[in-house]
Structures are given as C-alpha cells and as structure tokens.
Amino acid sequence: MPKSRISLVHQSSNPFSRNAALALAEVSFLNEVITTIAYNPEGAIAHTLHYLPKKMRDRLTQELGRRTWMPPERASIRSHPGREIARLALTKSGLNRRLGLAYLGSIDWVCTSLDCHVAKYHLQGLDAIYAYEDGAATSFQAAKQQGILCLYDLPILFYRLSREIQAEEAQRFPELAPALQAAQEPAWKLERKEQEIHLADHIFVPSSFIKRSLIDAEVKPDKVSVIPYGAPVDYFYPQSKPDQPFRAIFEIGRAHV
C-alpha cells in the first residue's frame, strides 16, 4: 500500500514545525517541507560567509542560524527566501518605518505570499497539506478543490480568546497596549484565521486550553486533537546576549486547564 504524501508548510524554522516534519518523515509520510529560508550550516552560503569581515560574518551567522532547517531523511526542502530576506533587510535597517512601508516589513507580507505560492505550485500529487496559522487560507482553498486533506497545526490560542484576553489587559495596563498585537490585528487577517479553521479537516493543538478556544469558535471537538509539547529541561541552555535590553515574553497559549 503506497504511503501518504504530505507536504508541511511553515514560514520559518522553529522547534514545533521542525519536529512535526521529523515525525512525518519517520513514518515516511513527508513529501517536502516548504518554507522561506532554510539555512544549512554546512552549505555553500555558510562557507561563503567565511570571506566576510568578522563582525558582519558573526551577525549574519547568528541571524541565519535561527533559520537552520535540515531536510529530514527521504524528504526535500523547498525554500522561497525572497520576501523574508527583503523583510529582514527592511526591519533591521529601519527603512520600513522611515519610508512608511510597515506592511512590507511585517511577517504577514511573507506568510500570505508563501501561502499563495504553495496554492499555485506545490499541491500537485499530494494526499495532504500540513500548515500553520496565518499561512494556510489560500492553499487550503486550492487543496479542497483538488480533494487534498487539509491538516492544521495551531500552537497558540485561537485569536478570538487571545484578542479578548489582550483587550482586557490593554484596559488594565494602557502603557502595554501597543505591545498587545492580537488586539490590533486587521479584519482581513482575522478573516483568514476564520477560513483556516473551517477549511481544515483536522486541527492539532498542544493543550486542552487551546482546544477550548477552538470549540468556543464553533469547531467540532472531534475535529481537534491535543498533542502536548514537552522536552527534557536538561537540554535547554540559554544563549549569551550580545546587548543589554530587557526582553519580556507574553505567553497565554499553552497552559493546560
């Protein structure tokens, strides 16, 4: 019996998307990974960096290292780096703010472009597509027309509950309001999120709390599977900081209730 062919789509390399790809590859389901930048520390780009001045080389190596994604066994990686490179250049230089190009410096610009590209060029011959929030609406619509299964991974709260919580926090702490992004997302982006959960044939989440946020949005409970995240704490080693600014993480998505 032939194995299923599943392609996984995520705009960047992070632990949950990499491990989802590895899990699919282990059972020979993974066809390919589709992303923006997939850096190979042993590849040609890494070797080219050695010819740059040390300060520039170290900075680029650190930035690219965060986007390391090696292809799992018997699978390939398709990278479409153009918009992500442009976004990084605009945001790191501050040009997006100075030139009034805020949208071109946003991750939404990258996600929607990759989503459209997948819909046009990467669905042929697939049994299923595995995608993530903000990067699946267009490809899921095209996949449905071709009878392709749509699998959706939501690692954070669905926006309705997240927006409600952040709106309350913004009222309590007005000085934090600019940092609470979920309460400020545009209507077109929220509509894409709604399309994604309703087009998905099955949704995977890491906690019962996130599952509840989907059920509250009228998603049927049997359409959602909880697969808890977890990792041995001994494997965590904080990276040294090259600068002094204090950084806080606002986290509401993964607690179990």
Language-model-detected regions and their locations in the chain:
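An aromatic- and histidine-rich active-site surface loop
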Residues: S13-R18, Y39-E42, H47-T48, I107-A119, ...
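Acceptor-binding helix/loop patch of EC 2.4 sugar-transfer enzymes
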Residues: A46-Y51, H80-S106, Q146-E191
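Carbohydrate-associated surface elements
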Residues: F209, G230, P242
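Short beta-strand->alpha-helix junction loop in the catalytic core
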Residues: K220, P228-Y237
